[in-house]
A protein has these predicted regions:
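Conserved core segment of the aminotransferase class I/II
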Residues: 55, 234-298, 393-396
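N-terminal basic, amphipathic alpha-helical segments
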Residues: 1-61, 267-273, 296, 300-303, ...
Length: 400
């Protein structure tokens, strides 16, 4: 009403600043039944092929005689064996020349992303460039640091160089986040010529590159960005998709000459990883049984992938035998949101493409579903069979 004063409501002190969006990803709870009608395919769940037994054994040894003791703060010198073990574990990754002094350990891959952002982002309104569809952890980490997240257009080979250059210049961006070996969620692979073109853009625009390699279980198919552009490329991996997510062990490799800045971020944030964990990592990552265990896990994942292809292969399904998730373009008649809801009604939990897109971006009518090896093959196949029935019978809805 004209003439009345402006009324300002008192802020609700109980309301959170940001929506409480859970990032919980455990798709098979501890001691849950392998036989289940409910099939959670949100995130991969590794098969237990001996790693739990090995970890328990090594934890016992560490507890009996911890190399770092139990009464001391973490130190750089004390953490060196774990960093050296991590560098050896990454030895086959095509990252160029690096060693233990280039490695900084983190509390999982997500923490490694956040630490790199904390190290690099500056200014009143920093900007992070991500792929058009991208791992949502990039967005969550950027949001924590009040950074703008800018999606960049892609084609079948990854981000388009011209689109990256345009976005970098128009937003004064500082870092480009990418998963060139196993793109999450589409499984796309970025070949070497495209990587070199993107690295050239990064040099022209003074962009850092963050390469997330957490989902690669097999051999790399092209040089990593740290080999192509060693002065500006940060690399992260973790043991969550290959050994276990329970230990929350992430590995970051800094560009040449920049590890000190990342170590400073780590030490200023939490002093360093807990010493029992670094002692365990130092033993686990170089243990002679570990390569065989990882091979067995990869083969078991491949079995689940093949069963999924047997059931859903008649549809537009994208898969790789050594990647623990699949990407499904929905047939005519289905929208991603409606299909996810219908699948949940049949006891199957999957992710819509829009979860990987920025808020105002367009997303295809596609879904991602992960390999849950915590379920029996029978339960896994039964859940996918119910998905197939839905795909074969889209809803007959006519909008008016």
């Amino acid at each position: 009403e004209v003439g009345r004063c402006t009324v300002v409501a008192r802020p609700d002190s109980k309301a959170p600043l940001l929506a409480d969006v859970s990032l919980e990803v455990d798709s098979a709870t501890h001691n849950s039944e392998a036989q289940s009608w409910h099939v959670n395919l949100f995130s991969p769940h590794l098969p237990n092929v001996g790693q739990a037994t090995l970890i328990r054994r090594l934890m016992t040894h560490v507890a009996q005689d911890p190399p770092s003791g139990l009464m001391h703060y973490p130190t750089r010198a004390g953490g060196h064996p774990a960093r050296a073990a991590a560098a050896q574990w990454l030895g086959t990754a095509p990252l160029g020349s690096f060693g233990a002094d280039d490695v900084v350990l983190a509390n999982g891959g997500q923490n490694a992303i956040l630490m790199i952002f904390q190290t690099l982002l500056c200014g009143r309104r920093p900007a992070v460039l991500v792929e058009e569809l991208a791992y949502l952890g990039f967005r969550r980490a950027a949001e924590l640091l009040r950074a703008d997240v800018i999606p960049v257009a892609m084609d079948a080979h990854g981000v388009i160089p011209e689109a990256l250059e345009a976005a970098a210049k128009s937003h004064a961006a500082q870092i480009f986040c990418t998963s060139p070996e196993v793109h999450n969620p589409t499984l796309a692979f970025t070949p070497q010529p495209r990587r070199e073109a993107l690295a050239a853009v990064a040099r022209r625009c003074d962009l850092h590159i963050l390469e997330d390699d957490c989902y690669r279980l097999g051999a790399a198919q092209a040089p990593g960005y740290r080999m192509i552009a060693p002065e500006r490329s940060w690399y992260i991996s973790s043991i969550s998709k290959s050994i276990t997510p329970a230990l929350r062990l992430g590995i970051a490799v800094a560009p040449e000459g920049q590890a000190a800045a990342l170590r400073r971020t780590s030490e200023y944030s939490f002093f360093g990883l807990a010493t029992p964990l670094t002692d365990l990592a130092a033993a686990l990552l170089v243990h002679p049984e570990l390569p065989g265990i990882m091979d067995a896990a990869r083969l078991r994942i491949g079995t689940y992938v093949q069963r999924a292809v047997n059931i859903l292969g008649a549809f537009d399904l994208i898969w790789r035998a050594d990647v623990p998730f699949l990407w499904l373009h929905l047939p005519e008649g289905w929208r991603a949101g409606a299909f996810v809801q219908a699948a949940e009604g049949q006891g199957v939990r999957i992710r819509a493409a829009e979860e990987y897109a920025c808020r105002d971006a367009r997303a295809p009518h596609a879904v991602r579903f992960a390999i849950n090896a915590g379920l029996s093959l029978d339960s896994f196949e039964a859940g996918l069979g119910r998905m197939r029935d839905l795909l074969d019978n889209p809803p007959d809805v006519i909008g008016v």
